[in-house]
Amino acid sequence: MASSRRPCRQLHQPRCGGPARPGSGARKFAFVFLPDFPAFSERMATEQPQMTLDPVVTLTAIARETERIGLVATSSTTFNEPYNLARQFKALDVVSHGRAGWNAVTTSDPAAAANYGQAVAERPERYGRAHEMLQVVEALWGSWGQDAWLKDKASGRFVDVSKVQPVNLQGQHVASRGHLPIPPSEQGQPVVFSAGGGQYGLTIAGRHASGVIGAAFTIEDARAQREAAREAAQEAGRDADDVKYFAGLMLGVGEDARDVLNRRLAYASDHLPSRLPYLGGMLGLELRSERIDEPLTPQELADARPSPFDPRSERALEVAREGWTLREVLVHGVIDYHPTPIGSPETIADHLQEWFEAGACDGFWLSPDVHDQDIDVFVDEVLPILRERGL
């Protein structure tokens, strides 16, 4: 879900729907975003399964029950063919009356590659294929002229075929020759998002994306990523404002931080001991699972050295110095890849305001602890605070 400084291109008529309770979030969220992982995860043995259903199919079901909210699905450019992706997303766009978006990503996971009977390609090859995929998919989407779809029952003419141009593209990795037999939706074609980092990902975002699904833990990192995406758009001959950067936020809303921590402990406590070595690596300490319900000793706090290669490490040490047990440090979300503010609605609003006013993002995508509860609280209690502050 997201709010933004300006609506994304193609989402110029924001289709924002109610997230949890019918009507509670109408016109408050620009889109719902589904990630994807096309492989079996060993974590399913002890944790709730996630990302097991095809996101396009899932969002098609959601489209039937909603009217305004945008529907953004993740699909890989590595293990799909352009015609299939163009057809699937154009169908979702038509079914939803112009609310579809494609988060175009490359895939480097060996388990996912094995499912498709392939090996993991080198990064330049993966992104070379991604560029070709996006060019072909967008060409297929754009093959219909806006006035090609006649729908004239009286004359019996439904399509002006002279205004449907065939695609004839041949690249090093993919190709397509022919027509996509699906007319434009109300928004024309699906919106393209990007979630890749580094120079390869920036090039994709600059040339093709209207939105970037960001992954930054600090304001400084987010601001740098946002500026890099804007510069990439300009280098591709586009306006910098054509690309919107959405910072991720894994929030927990409650009466206070203790209330949220208790809830997280109830849901996730069994999985935390296995993550203790990772926390130790971030702090330069050897941490054993039998000490998970103890805080760091004064000597350990003095010896701790946050990893200079991990921006989350400083936050982890900051939380540990507050006297929390190691289990509680972990449920603060210090090893998550996005900021994890917890506490009262005012605390969450403060975080959003600080990032937004610092120029770290154009909007946010939110992943709450408990969707049924936190989305309603966010809409009913956090958003009014932001409105009062003129945000």
Residue ranges and their predicted role:
Residues 124-187, 220-223, 231-356, 387-391:
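An alpha-helical appendage that flanks or caps ligand/catalytic pockets
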Residues 65-66, 70-115, 121-133:
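Hydrophobic or amphipathic alpha-helical targeting/insertion segments
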Residues 25-26, 59-67, 93-99, 234-240, ...:
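Acidic (Asp/Glu)-rich catalytic clusters
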Residues 1-65, 187-190, 300, 304:
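N-terminal beta1-alpha1-beta2 module of alpha/beta enzyme domains
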Residues 2-15, 74-83, 119, 186-199, ...:
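Active-site mouth loops of central-metabolism enzymes
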Residues 12-36, 204-214, 352-362:
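Catalytic domains of carbohydrate-active enzymes, especially glycoside hydrolases
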Residues 32-34, 69-75, 98-104, 190-195, ...:
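Hydrophobic faces of well-ordered beta-strands that scaffold small-molecule active sites
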Residues 28, 62, 92, 102, ...:
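Conserved, mostly hydrophobic/aromatic
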